[in-house]
Amino acid sequence: MNETKFQTKINSEIGELEAVILHTPGPEVENMTPRSVERALYSDILNLSVALQEYEQLSLLLEKITKVYQVKDLLVKVLDNTAHRNSLIGKICLTENVNDYYDELMEMSSRTLANKLIEGLPARIDSLTSFLNDEYYALLPLYNFYFTRDASAVVGNNAVICRMAKKISVRESLIMEAI
């Protein structure tokens, strides 16, 4: 694996950016339902096509002045490393109480796994109990992940991983910590 080591260093709020990490909104936004709006901390369902247009403009602007990294691409690189994959999936399964999905997640390709971790993993319906469960997802979509500044930040020479108050956002911090 070709790893790039990042030097995290911010000495100014107004200095030149050397790189940014973005997460372009995707299917996780479309997976939002009227029922999940409140849990996702929204007042309404987002229009993905509008959000994508705005994000494309932001990304194009940033690409003119700095290096832009996409969360999903960085996550795929993390998941290509077996030790990092085991650690991240173990933490996610433990935190979100989905230990019975560990093997299924570990068997996925890195790209598929990155997609499922962000877009959501539908729950198995293999029993009457799971059929009657109100929740469609074993791993909820990360509706808010395009706010990458919420889960992590750089202060001086250190990356600060924020612990999110809402359970739905904890996986965002775990992913950013792994990256």
Please state what every model-predicted region is.
Residues M1-I179:
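The feature marks the mature, well-folded catalytic cores of soluble enzymes
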